[in-house]
Amino acid sequence: MFEYAERLARWADALRSDTEWTSELESSFDAIGFDESYLSTLKEARRKYNRIKAIKDHIWGMIEIEPSDAWLLDSPLFQRMRHIRQTGLTYLTYPNAHHTRFEHSLGVYFVVKRLLATFRRTKEAFNIAAQHRTYLDIRFTPVAYERHSRQERLLLHAALLHDIGHAVFSHVSERLFAANSDRLRIGKKSIQQFRRSFQEKYDLVDSDIQTGRGKPLAELLTVGIITSSRFARFYRLLPGQPDTDPLPDLCDISTLVLGDRIEPNDFALPELLSGPVDADKIDYMIRDAHKPEHVN
């Protein structure tokens, strides 16, 4: 693992040792159907994930979902986002603004796939070395879905999972949490302490928080979910996933969600998901503006 993922692994270990966090998280998993009973059905269910699915999106048209990605999409964790509105409480004023994190995450996945396909077609241009350092060091592979490189596969999974830590009213909830960060608790810790524990393990300093390098709470919760023991057991059953400890992959996915590199020279890869002009922004700007009553 590269340095960012190693730092996340330290934080994940600390979270797993917090019995209250683990208990509350697993209770939340149980409440949405991501429980032991669901996990017990997955070995048999894997046989169904042997071909591409297609979902029609009103923004991007037909989105093809590859088997291992459909496995994530069909999980109760991802399906929960059908009930989380993208724009919080805006729909109360603009009735057409009722789109959800579910369709947004699908859109981000689609845009990332398009960007990767473009990179693949123009790989020679993007692999030109500048000052003896390769700008984009992605091991490109044929277009066939089963041959995606590890980096591409993890980026696509990060695209699907990047918003699973959002609370019920999206960013509105975050403002509520921020205003009560010393009183509301996550496991044994207040939200303030939870953020501080990440800051310490991820080697951020106070100035990082003040200058905006501090990670949003929704992203920290996403990382906590992805690196949890139960999610690791679920991910280990992923079609095509080797039967080994998935924590290195999950830490790399989490690193991409946070906008950091998973390889020393992968400067461009994380920016496809979290950069000045990234797949996340491309989708939500188009999707939010598409609703005629929700135009600023």
What are these regions (language model features)?
Residues 2-85, 89-157, 165-296:
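Sequence-structural signature of the catalytic-core scaffold of metal-dependent phosphohydrolases
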